[in-house]
């Protein structure tokens, strides 16, 4: 019993010292720079080191594979079906033409063969579906020491396993608590700060304080995720009175954009922790939070700038924006955000993971590396309508980020396909048949 | 991903039974898992996860075809509740492209199989005949959702087409002779000489370097 006492206090002392050291480090290297907006360059160094390690790991795996005379499994993401871009009309005409052993003037109005087209199309979509494919995470070519992205388990040697184990240790026992502490600090500062600022009388001072509180807290959050962001073309940054529009892969986009500029946000109301944060933010600055189904709030505001959100989609494509954001006649500043999946996959499949699981995944990855491109501003021309303008902005963003332009509306993932689309197909088909029918009755 | 010995044997067995290559089987297996949510079987509800399928007017017939015992070669009629991967491949194999290396007999067999699949789609009560009612049902489904076509027009279109089919199959009919329905032999007769093989298959992309981790 007595022998334990000195050890006890020793352990307690050690613990105390290490915690103090940790917090000092935290403060000096992370929070203080965040407040003032400077950077020590630690994260860039970290990224370079990691890249070297990943390259080595992939080399080892390839060597292992070569020894066994096999090839590494490279997932094929472009789909398995060669879809022919012919239209409904062309295909049906062709099918009927091939059945022209019947009398030429007696073109039947409806043939048993018409069902072929729909049958085949149906089978093709069951085998391989454009939209569902977009919603699964991208697959990597080199391994980033995260077991979630590895498909080649059998080529891992002992050295690699040790490295991987070390990686797990670092990520879960060192990085994770650090990040959680930072995130906690950042969020609580945000909530407290904005509430305090909310009590100030309206005026220039309030705006000034609000701006800095927001920026500071977002910068802390950025460091909490170890997000390494490269900004391009900062001269095109959104200015007062404009609308900032970006492609949306995850909730992290908001943090990334907001840490570089002071935005009033337009977004969907969330419950839980997000809801608390949202309500606090509103006190200091005119954000607008709406229910997803209601869209009348959009013309409320004296926007300073607003972020536009859509459904989370995989990084490789840009879905159609909600039409609403483009109907107000302001200048639009497009922003393209592209994540590098090598360090951590930022994609959030909301039907597979909840918010907390997603955040944990983010915080246990190595880092979030992304590039932000500020594109030159666009305004709606006199002869375009909202939809065309939206598409123009969307393709500019897609082109910049190297993302694939996709005409689908991301809302498909949640709701069933709108009946109008289904009707379009059927209308087209029936027009063809009724057209023939009418011709016959006239002759 | 199956790296175990038994899995590759299974693949070889499936290759033999259904005629797909091992690459294609692997791809289809991934798709199967995606549709079933990692379960070993698929039910009708799982097809709701394919948004593109909603656009198809005969969606319900296609989904039904997957569970049709006649297509699964499990019986003369009725529907299965759920299907496993082998059943899934069996249905998909009806849409395999015609292999250029097949001989004439095999081509003929393949063609018959494809037409039988189609026949089953029309003949929903499994009595071996496509009656006027069943035909009308298909036409209505294909034309459904269009407010400009009244039910009457859809019916008359179906009736007209049915008369065509009757004339091909039975020749001139007596005034009081009733045409009971299209049997499978009549169905084949209608399609004689017409090339349907190129229309009833799914075109797989040529996949390179897709070696599995055996």
From Swiss-Prot, chain B:
Expressed in mature megakaryocytes and polymorphonuclear granulocytes (at protein level). Abundantly expressed in heart. Also expressed at a lower level in adult testis and salivary gland, and in the placenta. Signal peptide: none annotated. Residues 110-145 form the EF-hand domain. It is a lipid-anchor. Residues 1-20 are annotated as: Disordered. Belongs to the calcineurin regulatory subunit family. CHP subfamily. This is Calcineurin B homologous protein 3. It comes from Homo sapiens.
């Amino acid at each position: 019993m007595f022998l334990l006492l000195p050890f006890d206090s020793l352990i307690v002392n050690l613990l105390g010292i290490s915690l103090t050291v940790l917090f000092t480090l935290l403060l000096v290297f992370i929070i203080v720079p965040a407040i003032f907006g400077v950077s020590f360059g630690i994260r860039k160094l970290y990224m370079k080191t990691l890249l070297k390690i990943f390259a080595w790991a992939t080399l080892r795996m390839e060597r292992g594979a070569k020894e066994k005379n096999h090839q590494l499994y490279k997932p094929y993401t472009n789909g398995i079906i060669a879809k022919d871009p012919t239209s409904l009309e062309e295909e049906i005409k062709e099918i009927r033409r091939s059945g022209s052993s019947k009398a030429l003037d007696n073109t039947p109005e409806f043939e048993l063969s018409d069902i072929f087209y729909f049958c085949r199309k149906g089978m093709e979509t069951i085998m391989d579906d454009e939209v569902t494919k977009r919603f699964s995470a991208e697959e990597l070519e080199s391994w980033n020491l995260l077991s979630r992205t590895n498909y080649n388990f059998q080529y891992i040697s002992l050295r690699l396993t040790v490295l991987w184990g070390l990686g797990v240790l670092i990520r879960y026992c060192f990085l994770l608590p650090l990040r959680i502490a930072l995130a906690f600090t950042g969020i609580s500062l945000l909530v407290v700060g904005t509430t305090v600022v909310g009590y100030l009388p309206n005026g220039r001072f309030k705006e000034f304080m609000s701006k800095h509180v927001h920026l500071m807290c977002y910068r802390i959050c950025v460091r909490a995720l170890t997000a390494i962001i490269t900004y391009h073309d900062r001269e095109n940054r959104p200015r007062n009175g404009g609308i900032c529009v970006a492609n949306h892969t995850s909730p992290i986009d908001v943090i990334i954009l907001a840490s570089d500029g002071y935005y009033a946000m337009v977004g969907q109301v969330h419950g839980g922790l997000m809801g608390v944060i949202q309500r606090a933010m509103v006190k200091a600055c005119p954000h607008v939070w709406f229910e997803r189904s209601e869209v009348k709030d959009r013309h409320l505001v004296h926007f300073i700038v607003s972020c536009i959100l859509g459904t989370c989609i995989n990084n490789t494509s840009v879905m159609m924006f909600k039409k609403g954001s483009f109907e107000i006649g302001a200048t639009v500043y497009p922003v393209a955000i592209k994540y590098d999946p090598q360090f951590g996959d930022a994609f959030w499949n909301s039907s597979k993971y909840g918010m907390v699981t997603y955040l944990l995944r983010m915080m246990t990855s190595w880092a979030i590396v992304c590039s932000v491109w500020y594109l030159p501003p666009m305004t709606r021309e006199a002869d375009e309508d909202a939809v065309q303008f939206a598409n123009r902005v969307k393709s500019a963003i897609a082109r910049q980020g190297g993302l694939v332009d996709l005409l689908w509306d991301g809302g498909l993932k949640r709701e069933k396909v709108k009946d109008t689309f289904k009707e379009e197909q059927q209308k087209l088909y029936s027009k063809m048949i009724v057209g023939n029918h009418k011709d016959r009755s006239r002759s | 991903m199956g790296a175990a010995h038994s899995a590759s044997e299974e693949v070889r067995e499936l290759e033999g039974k259904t005629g797909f290559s091992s690459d294609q089987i692997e791809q289809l297996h991934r798709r199967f898992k995606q549709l079933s949510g990692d379960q070993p079987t698929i039910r009708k509800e799982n097809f709701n996860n394919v948004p593109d399928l909603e656009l198809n007017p005969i969606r319900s017939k296609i989904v039904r075809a997957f569970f049709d015992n006649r297509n699964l070669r499990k019986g003369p009629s009725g529907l299965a509740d759920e299907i496993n991967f082998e059943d899934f491949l069996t249905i998909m194999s009806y849409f395999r492209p015609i292999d250029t290396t097949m001989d004439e007999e095999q081509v003929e067999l393949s063609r018959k199989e494809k037409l039988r699949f189609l026949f089953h789609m029309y003949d929903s009560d499994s009595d071996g005949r496509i009656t006027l009612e069943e035909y009308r049902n298909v036409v209505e489904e294909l034309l459904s959702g269009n407010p400009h076509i009244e039910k009457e027009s859809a019916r008359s279109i179906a009736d007209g087409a049915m008369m065509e089919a009757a004339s091909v199959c039975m020749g001139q009919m007596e005034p009081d002779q009733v045409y009971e329905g299209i049997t499978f032999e009549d169905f084949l007769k209608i399609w004689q000489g017409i090339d349907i093989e190129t229309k009833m298959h799914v075109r797989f992309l040529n996949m390179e370097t897709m070696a599995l981790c055996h």
